[in-house]
């Protein structure tokens, strides 16, 4: 497989890995701290030399690759909720990258989090709140808000809402990277087998 295809599939796995966590938190009210940290860390790597630099935690990406196989492969049971979130993220990504003003604000706010990390861990509540604030202030303003399904008891909690928004920001970061690497929505229809094969090979590396 070509390096670009490998890297593009890695970025797509990054989207789905974040989406999977959104779904889990919305249903169960909690998250895997390492997986959460890996997704949030990807937002902060804005000038990578390679795509692998964005996704340092390869273990955390496994869920993303597995979702590629199940969502785009031959499995009869597709997760329509994951598909809905993915479609929403890709639509918002197009609006984001077409807005130089939004991209500029995004860069500035991410730099603020970089400075904050000299005092806090990336999964501390204050940092997650800032990631969530970026999503609310910049991304949510670009188009229709994503409707998150889950347990109402968990969804009304501020901490749950902030983790979900922070993870949606991570999904957006991966969507931007996927597009920069040549990803197009038509590939998800006409190049599904190639993407699935690449994901399956990536799972064995």
UniProtKB/Swiss-Prot annotation:
Organism encoding this protein? Shewanella halifaxensis (strain HAW-EB4)
Question: What name does UniProt use for this protein?
Answer: High frequency lysogenization protein HflD homolog
**Is Cell membrane one of the keywords UniProt gives this record?**
yes
Gene3D superfamilies recorded: HflD-like
Q: Which UniProt keyword terms apply here? A: Cell inner membrane, Cell membrane, Cytoplasm, Membrane
Membrane topology per the record?
Peripheral membrane protein
Where located?
Cytoplasm; Cell inner membrane
Q: Which HAMAP family match?
A: HflD_protein
- Database matches in InterPro entries: HflD, HflD-like_sf
By its UniProt entry, which NCBIfam families does this protein fall under?
PRK00218.1-2 (NF001246), PRK00218.1-4 (NF001248)
Q: Which family does it belong to?
A: Belongs to the HflD family.
User: What are the record's GO terms for cellular component?
Assistant: cytoplasm; plasma membrane
């Amino acid at each position: 497989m070509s390096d670009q295809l490998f890297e593009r599939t890695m970025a797509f796995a990054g989207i789905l890995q974040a989406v999977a966590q959104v779904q889990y938190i919305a249903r169960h009210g909690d998250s895997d701290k390492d997986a959460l940290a890996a997704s949030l860390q990807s937002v902060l790597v804005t000038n990578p030399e390679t795509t692998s630099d964005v996704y340092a935690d390869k273990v955390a990406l496994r869920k993303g690759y597995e979702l590629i196989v199940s969502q785009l492969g031959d499995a009869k049971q597709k997760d329509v909720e994951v598909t809905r979130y993915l479609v929403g993220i890709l639509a918002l990504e197009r609006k984001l990258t077409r807005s130089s003003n939004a991209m500029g604000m995004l860069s500035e706010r991410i730099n603020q989090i970089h400075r904050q990390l000299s005092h806090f861990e990336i999964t501390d509540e204050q940092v997650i709140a800032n990631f969530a604030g970026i999503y609310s202030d910049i991304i949510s303003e670009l188009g229709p808000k994503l409707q998150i399904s889950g347990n109402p008891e968990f969804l009304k909690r501020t901490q749950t809402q902030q983790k979900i928004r922070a993870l949606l920001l991570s999904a957006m970061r991966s969507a931007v990277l996927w597009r920069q690497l040549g990803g197009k929505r038509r590939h998800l229809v006409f190049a599904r087998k190639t993407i699935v094969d690449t994901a399956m090979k990536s799972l064995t590396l």
